[in-house]
């Protein structure tokens, strides 16, 4: 027969084991709750301030380097379509590749000097503020004279335009009435799509451009010279006026780079336009040489 003391000791041992198990479960549960709460607080702070100051500065500097300087953008030939409509080479209408709208007489256009592609000034300014290439053929607009010539862009660039236009952003437009910059944007539907990496599916995700000539403005040599001279003179006048008034918004290095770009555009303009736009090579005129000399003198003063 079992002694009474033995039964009491067995009951105490069972109770002790159960107590230890419950205590262990309580400790594990408490630790889990604390861990979850701490993790939630950490990720909440990360979502509010995901980047450190150094990350923000680095991202800002990278973004700033990607686009063109505003003064360089303004140095591209800018004019009203009515000024060149009757003097351009070719037949048919000319359209802006950004908003797919045909140009009208009262609209201001901006011409890419390296490839002769033309866009609405407002449309292409948005692109050039984040990129340094032509939005249509992707020719580099910042090439220096010693680098690969921008007169002969890679053939793949033009063909890839069918599937890479604007990094996967398709602009579509169905109506073409008279419009301003704001109404052009309201008519254009911007749809985010997968970039060229989705071509493995077997079909293009961007509408093909079957005729790039409708986005190209070819002008006679004399007209081109007049537009270039007018634009460069306007930029030089604006720079000189702002310098005299003491309202410089850029450093001396930035100003010198702009003037250097303008001189390069003068020195290469004859060859660039005649070669890339289908014209014949013409020797620089006395006016062009005079403008280059005056521009160099103005740069030295600055």
Swiss-Prot record:
One of its GO terms (cellular component) is membrane. A zinc finger (RING-type) spans 96-138. Keywords: Membrane, Metal-binding, Transferase, Transmembrane, Transmembrane helix, Ubl conjugation pathway, Zinc, Zinc-finger. The chain crosses the membrane at residues 15-35. It is an enzyme of class 2 (transferase). GO terms for biological process: protein ubiquitination. It holds the Pfam family zf-RING_2. Signal peptide: none annotated. Its main location: membrane. Disulfide bonds: none annotated. It is a single-pass membrane protein. Pathway: Protein modification; protein ubiquitination. Its EC number is 2.3.2.27. It catalyses: S-ubiquitinyl-[E2 ubiquitin-conjugating enzyme]-L-cysteine + [acceptor protein]-L-lysine = [E2 ubiquitin-conjugating enzyme]-L-cysteine + N(6)-ubiquitinyl-[acceptor protein]-L-lysine. GO terms for molecular function: transferase activity; zinc ion binding. Residues 279-302 are annotated as: Disordered. Gene3D superfamilies: Zinc/RING finger domain, C3HC4 (zinc finger) (3.30.40.10). Residues 286-302 have a biased composition (Basic and acidic residues). It is found in: Membrane. The RING-type zinc finger domain mediates binding to an E2 ubiquitin-conjugating enzyme. Belongs to the RING-type zinc finger family. ATL subfamily. This is RING-H2 finger protein ATL38. It comes from Arabidopsis thaliana (Mouse-ear cress). The gene is ATL38.
């Amino acid at each position: 027969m079992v002694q009474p003391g033995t039964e009491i000791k067995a009951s105490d041992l069972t109770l002790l084991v159960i107590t230890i198990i419950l205590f262990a479960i309580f400790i594990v549960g408490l630790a889990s709750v604390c861990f979850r709460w701490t993790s939630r607080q950490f990720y909440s702070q990360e979502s509010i301030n995901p980047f450190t100051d150094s990350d923000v500065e680095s991202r800002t500097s990278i973004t700033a380097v990607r686009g063109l300087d505003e003064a360089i953008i303004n140095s591209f030939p800018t004019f009203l379509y009515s000024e060149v409509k009757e003097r351009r080479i070719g037949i048919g209408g000319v359209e802006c590749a950004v908003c797919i709208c045909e140009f009208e007489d009262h609209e201001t256009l901006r011409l890419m000097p390296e490839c002769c592609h033309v866009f609405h000034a407002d449309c292409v300014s948005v692109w050039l503020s984040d990129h340094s290439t032509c939005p249509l053929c992707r020719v580099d607009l910042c090439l220096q004279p010693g680098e690969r010539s921008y007169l002969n862009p890679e053939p793949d660039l033009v063909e890839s335009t069918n599937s890479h236009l604007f990094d996967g952003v398709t602009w579509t437009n169905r109506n073409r009435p008279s419009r301003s910059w704001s109404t052009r944007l309201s008519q254009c539907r911007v749809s985010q799509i997968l970039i060229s990496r989705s071509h493995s599916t077997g079909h293009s995700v961007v509408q093909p451009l079957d005729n790039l000539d409708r986005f190209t403005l070819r002008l006679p040599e004399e007209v081109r010279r007049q537009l270039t001279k007018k634009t460069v003179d306007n930029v030089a006048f604006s720079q000189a006026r702002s310098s005299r008034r003491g309202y410089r918004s850029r450093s001396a290095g930035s100003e010198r780079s702009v003037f250097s770009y303008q001189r390069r555009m003068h020195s290469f303009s004859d060859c660039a336009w005649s070669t890339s736009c289908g014209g014949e090579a013409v020797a620089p005129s006395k006016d062009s040489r005079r403008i280059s000399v005056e521009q160099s003198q103005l740069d030295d003063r600055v």
